[in-house]
Amino acid sequence: MDRSRVLEQLIPELTGLLSLLDHEYLSDSTLEKKMAVASLLQSLQPLPAKEVSFLYVNTADLHSGPSFVESLFEEFDCDLGDLRDMSDDGEPSKGASPEPTKSPSLRSAAADVPPPLPNKPPPEDYYEEALPLGPGKSPEYISSHNGCSPAQSIVDGYYEDADNSYPTTRMNGELKNSYNDSDAMSSSYESYDEEEEEEKGRQPKHQWPSEEASMHLVRDCRICAFLLRKKRFGQWAKQLTVIKEEQLLCYKSSKDRQPHLRLALDVCTVIYVPKDSRHKRHELRFSQGATEVLVLALQSREQAEEWLKVIREVSRPIVGAEGLEVPRSPVILCKADQDKRLSQEKQNSDSDSLGMNDSGSTLGRREACEHGKGKKNSLAELKGSMSRAAGRKITRIISFSKKKALSEDLQTFSSEDEVPCCGYLNVLVNQGWKERWCRLRCNTLYFHKDRTDLHTHVNSIALRGCEVAPGFGPRHPFAFRILRNRQEVAILEASCSEDMGRWLGLLLVEMGSKVTPEALHYDYVDVETLTSIVSAGRNSFLYAQSCQDQWPEPRIYDEVPYEKVQDEEPQRPTGAQVKRHASSCSEKSHRADPQVKVKRHASSANQYKYGKNRAEEDARRYLVEKERLEKEKETIRTELTALRQEKKELKEAIRNNPGAKSKALEEAVATLEAQCRAKEEQRIDLELKLVAVKERLQQSLAGGPALGLSVSNKNKSQDTTNKPQSNAPEQSLPVNCVSELRKRSPSIVTSNQGRVLQKAKEWEMKKT
């Protein structure tokens, strides 16, 4: 085989081998040898202009001393003499001689350059100049002198901080530390911009330690750099930023083993803000939902585009078997909001104390912090409540095997299983949200760092004499405040509307307040969310009241034996015996003696109070429904007009052109008439619904009942004629949800249906 052809095959094979070695951990000597081979390959086959990221210019005379670049090649011997004996698969033959031989091509190449000079220390006047990179080519990869470098560090360029162990050379006229044998090959560079040198002189340099360096932090990473991260109050701090395994990790120092911030990129939104007169830096802003969780500053637009490219590759969805895009990590959502917004790695605030006490000190300012809590990772989302329940059981088993638990601990665990008076809440601490396990006990709210550590609590609030007020701005619709003497004691946030309603009901009972969840004023929530909060709050409020009345066990429905119902007036007793199915909305009752005669009145029942909040809620709902129906009505009217116009044109065509096509035109006219009739029926149904909604809207705006609690004059007269003596028995009957629903008046739609249909039919008769 021809030697030139062998060289042509050898160069790509060596290039592939070097690319594979870039991903391996190499020692110092092996790394230097690899870089020497890479330099030889570059001299044989130069890289394209776009991939050349550095250039060294040696200004020293050849006779004044050896160049460090030249001295690196002296130890490298390329065995090219035995290339003829190489087999086709690239393995050397057994008879190959281990002695290196010089090829004629190498001899001719060696004759063009001066012979190598002996290794001597460089003269004092020797220096090398490095041409700086182009604009935007900022260093991004960091390597230590122990030889562990991240992937593709040769192409992208990185820098190393020198230490005192290297010999000194004169760089640009000043004594500086050199890199000895790795200076020329490490694609490092020196910046000669005066402003950058002054800025570097003011700021401490980040340097990897020699042996104990955490180089595993940047191993197998997609991209990493020391970037400026925006802190809470606008300051900037330089931190090591790494993208690894679909996550963005921030380390305060290169010596840290654990990241200061961990951010899942597949659930984040990234916005690039270029540098301009308003923004002094190129910024990447990471947000989760409506919360901005991280801001990074980059040195150039090219660097920002490179980071954005890596982020897009990381967060790109996976294509499933059926061609559908599947997200890389599951994000579990409930109907209205997220089921639980837990976070395992959150941004630590400056202080771990809650900053509140019984004297009424405030827990934090009203302004929401800029960095919200991060979302929990995919593993915790998949576990959910089942893993928490399993963890609780395992904790109980382990604690029981180690030592016998106290009666108080057993009572605590049993109360967690039976009574829903505990759960996770976000607490505002020093303008930062922290997640705490909150527990209600003996009119006191306890805060724990975790649900497994119930022996100690971070802080507690005595709830007697306090008030609760929902709302903490539009960004936190599920937040509520605990007030004492009109001063904020704590600001808490629930995970969803049901959880917020449950806590409001429990807190109102523990505070001893007579205010119900329906009477509270809710802001920053829509009608559906408000209904969910009020419903959950009412249920938990009545549930907590029944538990406070010494019920042996909580029940939603309980059966009571037949009991005689007595009226307040002893002269008119009733002998009716009723089997009562009391719901959680009924009055409080004691179960000490189940055969006791209970006195129940319909007037004393806990009927639904149609208050101001409920009226406003119904008014908003009916207003939205009215607008929707009017839009549908206009749409149907437009379609009817178009159909009638088309039918009119077809009839004119039939009159003008009687002939063979008239039959087809008549069939088209019949089809259009059928469509017109169907649209007309839809319009009549919409008219019926619209009239009913308008009447309900008027009643809700006037503050009247919209749920049938009071009837019209016509219905009242009918009820009085049918039941002339219904006053006395109704006052003595017990409350039953089914009977109350049956006694309600018929809906407004049925009372107005005949009249509207009659008018619609009259209108149709007039049209025809």
UniProtKB/Swiss-Prot annotation:
GO cellular component terms, A-Z: anchoring junction; cell projection; cytoplasm; podosome; stress fiber
Span list, region Disordered: 83-145, 165-211, 340-382, 564-609, 705-768
Coiled coil spans: 611-701
Pfam family, one: PH
Domain PH: 220-316, 418-512
Location of Phosphotyrosine modifications: Y557
Modified residues (Phosphoserine): S87, S93, S97, S103, S153, S329, S343, S747
KW Repeat (keyword) present: yes
Domain of life (superkingdom): Eukaryota
Bias-annotated ranges (Basic and acidic residues): 340-349, 587-596, 759-768
UniProtKB keywords: Cell junction, Cell projection, Coiled coil, Cytoplasm, Cytoskeleton, Phosphoprotein, Repeat
Residue ranges, compositional bias (Polar residues): 165-185, 350-362, 710-734
UniProt cross-references to InterPro entries, sorted A to Z: AFAP, PH-like_dom_sf, PH_domain
Location in or out of the cell: Cytoplasm; Cell projection, Podosome; Cell projection, Invadopodium; Cytoplasm, Cytoskeleton, Stress fiber
Main function: May be involved in podosome and invadosome formation.
Assembly behavior: Interacts with CTTN.
Protein name, UniProt field: Actin filament-associated protein 1-like 1
Organism name: Mus musculus
Lineage: Eukaryota, Metazoa, Chordata, Craniata, Vertebrata
Gene designation per UniProt: Afap1l1
